[in-house]
Amino acid sequence: MQEFLGFGVVGNFAGHLEQAGESHSFINMKSEEKDAPKGLFPFYIPYENCYLGRCCIDNHKIILPSDPHLRVQAEPEIALECDVKYDEKHLVTKLVPNFFMAFNDASVRNLEAAKLSQKKNFSPASKGIGQKLPIDRFVYGGVCNNFSIASFLKYNHVWHIYGENSKLLKYEFFYQKLLDWIKNQLNYQQDGDSLEALRPFLERHNFPTKMIFAIGATPYMPFAQEHFLQKGDEVVIIAYNHLQYSFEKIQNLLEEDALQTKEHANLSYVYQIVE
């Protein structure tokens, strides 16, 4: 992961932006479609001489910001590991997703920041990425049709449902529609409001051919809306084959402490303890 550029999609699940308190940042944005994502932000750009150059992936812990007044929430997402193709003008022409996985795009909520990315890479352990699951074909009818994403938080020794249990097909933009949108943002997104122009990152890194895209967070359940991460909390985000596992089975794996102690096919998870 350390050599991959990492980007995140803003607003690809109905209701999440409003819950996260970020919708005001995009009130002036014009979209061709009502439910289109709002933009693409960088969360990790290797060797950048700023906070974005800090490797922020840790699959075992979340390190909270040093300022104790900053409030952080987990963001349950799916990430895609993609090959990136360019034309002779170095415009992105194609994204080829090879793997998908559970992802935690933990974010600061109350930081006064010019750019959304400043709320994303807040420590050396502000993101988490699960086991890679191979993609047979990233089209309707492929393996992703059969997967859902669930998330949980353990607080005071009790597991709580964190985000909505959601099929991946509930993403507003998915499959080729999502890939085309990401391609367009990489090529043409301009600096404005809380988003950066992205092409300069690609230019400075000699047009990299591997990237990770976190494709948007699920809406929160009531507990998660009111609870900000505290030291000792345990966060779990799971992408699972819902033809093989019921939601209740996933819950039982946590309650029985069997998620990390046994091998599980067709399942990708992030399990982090908050420090």
Regions found by a protein language model. Give the residues of each.
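Glycine-enriched loop-and-adjacent helix/strand subsegments that border the catalytic/binding cleft
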Residues: Q2-H205, H227, K249-E275
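Glycine-rich beta-strand-to-loop/alpha-helix junction loops that act as flexible
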Residues: V9-G11, T209-M221
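Short, charged beta-turn/beta-strand-edge "cap" motif at the junction between a beta-strand
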Residues: A14, A217-P222, Y240-Y245
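Loop/turn positions that initiate beta-strands
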Residues: P208-K210, Q230-V236
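Short glycine/threonine-rich loop-to-helix capping motif typified by GTGT followed
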Residues: F223-Q230
